Amino acid sequence: DAYDQEKLDSKLIELDGTENKSNLGANSILAVSLATAKAAAISSKKELFAHISKSDEYLIPVPMLNVINGGKHAENSTDIQEFMIVPVGFRTFSDAIKAGSEVYQSLQKNLSESNLSTTVGDEGGFAPQLPSNESALEILVDAITSSGYECGHHFLIALDVAAAELFDSESKLYNLVREKKFVSGEQLSEMYSTWVEKYPIISIEDGLSDDEWNDWEKMTRRVGSKVQLVADDLLTTNPIRISKGIESKAANAVLIKPNQIGTLSETLEAISLVQSVGWGTVISHRSGETEDTFISDL
């Protein structure tokens, strides 16, 4: 029965028979799970988002637009993997995208005029060679204002640090190549705290390495009241790990990636769990995935 999504997904999980869906593969299972949901929506003559939702109340999401790439997504750029602009001061989604495009074009122009590279990284953001991580924030603020918009009103800034890629498990330190130094989790949190006071930062994803639970708790106590702290690698869209994160108060928002957990039902369970305690959710694609638009309906 295509209308019984939970039963279908349970059957797929049972058929796979492994904890991490390694037999059939999470991507294969997810493809069947999502295709079934699409078929059921078409059959019932509903929009996909209406078919998925158990509520009649809908909210248009705010886009997070990746405009500067670093880390593993762009060699020789910043240590931080993604610098994003968040268009919050616009009446419609299309207005927000239009404004985001204008800032992107201004960013390209400003980089060119500063003799900085405008080649792009894996995620489509520019990957200039910059002297420091903070200089990327300064460049973003300049791009926003030179486009005729106001920082803090029309646009906010979000970061995906991907700190696990900087972390040395033996020394328990983070290698900031651009800063030419190694820092502790506490020092990294202190850096974020300084930036949050100085720049219109609204969200920091993967600010610390996965499984560094104590440091995540400390970071959340330190800056969690001022900024969204999004856990991706720490919680992996997994309801069990999300429950642990909620209990320990590590983070205050979760990145949701359907192909990280493997079925639509488990994805919706994770979203429901996160929202039940008032945490934020950020729906995300995966690097290198297809152009399928399913996640826009979640």
PLM ranges: what are they?
Residues 12-18, 54-58, 68, 89-90, ...:
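Acidic, glycine-rich active-site loops and adjacent beta-strand->loop/helix elements
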Residues 134-298:
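Catalytic core of soluble alpha/beta enzymes
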Residues 82-93, 117-133, 165-179:
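Active-site-proximal beta-alpha loop/turn segments in soluble metabolic enzymes
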Residues 1-42, 46, 97, 125:
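Metal- or metallocofactor-binding catalytic centers and their adjacent structured scaffolds
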Residues 46-64:
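Glycine/threonine-rich beta-strand-loop-alpha-helix active-site module
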Residues 58-121:
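Mobile "lid/hinge" segments at catalytic clefts and subdomain interfaces of large enzymes
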Residues 2-8, 26, 48-51, 108-125, ...:
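Flexible, glycine/charged-enriched surface loops at secondary-structure junctions
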Residues 1, 13-17, 41-46, 53, ...:
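Generic secondary-structure signature for well-ordered alpha-helical cores
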